[in-house]
Amino acid sequence: MNREKIFIIAGEDSGDLHGAKLIESLKKKNPSAEFFGIGGNRMQSAGLILIEHIKNLNVIGIFEVIKHYPRIKKIFNKTIKEIKKIRPHKVILIDYPGFNLRLAKELKALNFNITYFILPQVWAWKESRIKVLKDCCNKLISIIPFEKTWFAKKGLDVHYIGHPLSSLSNQTVSYTHLTLPTTPVV
């Protein structure tokens, strides 16, 4: 039997953190699985075979994207080429919608199984992205409680799993712990 191959794409530091935790969790369920993709040091330490480091995708704002577009486009094309070569059982896209939603369109046309983990905040802006999620993704996973209901009203089945970092803080922080005033300042 072939080892399960999973291709994961994160484009920023927060995605690298969540991706590393995801890889660790998936390895517990399937220790022989192989992980390939775009990530950072955390994902690589968790077992990801890097095809590109996120530091090469880190751009903020439209002007930075325009300035670095040739590099981003080259990475995009390389990603598609690597996915075609590796033929993963599943592709997991983590947040980073500007890149990952375009990638979802390309990969769906090639019949890949696509999971989107940490959904674009289409409820805040660019609601038009819902169509791409609906048409191109096989599974949608949310970390924000209200998204399951919100997306259901739009006709999408979303799995809510809770926030991956919630286990890092199991106590409530009070104003006194932060030494903040409990009465209005102004």
Model-identified regions with their sequence ranges:
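Active-site and donor-binding regions of nucleotide-sugar-utilizing enzymes
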Residues: 4-174, 178
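Single conserved hydrophobic/aromatic residue that forms the stacking wall/gate
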Residues: 177-186
